[in-house]
């Protein structure tokens, strides 16, 4: 197994241009596919999850042209649904942002489509989405365990109507349903059961749909109305914002060991909820400066916070490791959906924080972290989870440094993360 040793870092400073958002990249690729016209996507993320989506689209007959560095994609839309005369089997790795939306989109047309993935994908729930699609007339069959991939879709189109979907597990279920609803045979009313997690991710979806000419009526996140007869029209160009979750590591670095760290590609005009991570750092005592398309973090003594972070679940992981450098006990609440991500992130985070000496209380949907008097060095397991590797890079700011196991797992969203992280040192 590959390991990366991060020696102690005294101070960080510099500027990082954040690579494109995974969430926006895969949503935009699917909408461009369903749209009429050719769309040029710029600042597209070049990572494993996006490659799985692109490979699947190519297999489904979608034509696109990628720039040499894979960050510009010119895609010819189908002007409607995806159909195939022959049976197709698509491998989607561990890319939830490809599996859930494609599962929904492939019910719209005609054909037989089988969706598979890595072993962890077979543990990531999709049942709530499939139940909703079945209610609208879709024929979806599980190949192993009910409620989980792999699955086969025998597509004949999607009816309109009223449908319920759970909101308390993953916003990706609702996102997938929203994106396909305009191409159903009738109007669709989506009723959300339970508290909707990660509302800002739904805002991203609705904003992108609007860019492609489709209107969603949002009744206070409890009901969403999509009127029949709409179609996606290419806006010609889509700029993919920098990934706000990825920005969190560099902003935390600035807060802990700044110096001054500036991230560009996200800012106050961002449509991503995870930019609110900077507000949490500010509550902890960091000096934060906002621009339209940049955020600056400067170092200052940090104190613990006790906050509901349901609205920023991915970026909240960075707070868990930043808490080791804050005075007092930090509590991160309402984060049950950490458990159904690339790994069970609540259990993984608790295990690895204890390795470095932290006192940790792991609840069903919260984590409570008290830093040790002296942080210990350790070998951090990353569970094939990109965010675990990036979060624990913060331990380079301890006097003892840290070792990261399987550092290349960052290829899911940020292949050259550790190179960029090193550029801030000195």
From Swiss-Prot:
Q: PROSITE patterns from the entry?
A: EPSP_SYNTHASE_1, EPSP_SYNTHASE_2
Mind listing the UniProt keywords for this protein, alphabetically? Amino-acid biosynthesis, Aromatic amino acid biosynthesis, Cytoplasm, Transferase
Q: Which residues form a coiled coil?
A: none
The subcellular localization recorded is: Cytoplasm
Where is the chain membrane-spanning? none
Q: Its Gene Ontology biological processes?
A: amino acid biosynthetic process; aromatic amino acid family biosynthetic process; chorismate biosynthetic process
Gene3D superfamilies, per the entry: Enolpyruvate transferase domain (3.65.10.10)
Its Enzyme Commission number? 2.5.1.19
Q: What class of enzyme is it?
A: transferase
Q: In which pathway does it act?
A: Metabolic intermediate biosynthesis; chorismate biosynthesis; chorismate from D-erythrose 4-phosphate and phosphoenolpyruvate: step 6/7
What is the active site of this protein?
A: 314 (proton acceptor)
This entry carries the following GO cellular component terms, namely: cytoplasm
Residues at which 3-phosphoshikimate binds? 22-23, 27, 170-172, 198, 314, 337, 341
Q: Which InterPro entries match?
A: Enolpyruvate_Tfrase_dom, Enolpyruvate_Tfrase_sf, EPSP_synthase, EPSP_synthase_CS, RNA3'P_cycl/enolpyr_Trfase_a/b
* Catalysed transformations (reactions): 3-phosphoshikimate + phosphoenolpyruvate = 5-O-(1-carboxyvinyl)-3-phosphoshikimate + phosphate
GO MF annotation list: 3-phosphoshikimate 1-carboxyvinyltransferase activity
Residues binding phosphoenolpyruvate, per UniProt = 22, 96, 124, 172, 345, 387, 412
The entry describes its oligomerization and partners as: Monomer.
Cross-referenced PANTHER family, in alphabetical order? AROM/DEHYDROQUINATE SYNTHASE (PTHR21090), PENTAFUNCTIONAL AROM POLYPEPTIDE (PTHR21090:SF5)
Q: Please name the HAMAP family in this protein's record.
A: EPSP_synth
Report the family membership: Belongs to the EPSP synthase family.
Which function does this protein serve?
A: Catalyzes the transfer of the enolpyruvyl moiety of phosphoenolpyruvate (PEP) to the 5-hydroxyl of shikimate-3-phosphate (S3P) to produce enolpyruvyl shikimate-3-phosphate and inorganic phosphate.
Q: Would you tell me the protein name for this molecule?
A: 3-phosphoshikimate 1-carboxyvinyltransferase
Organism name: Shewanella sp. (strain W3-18-1)
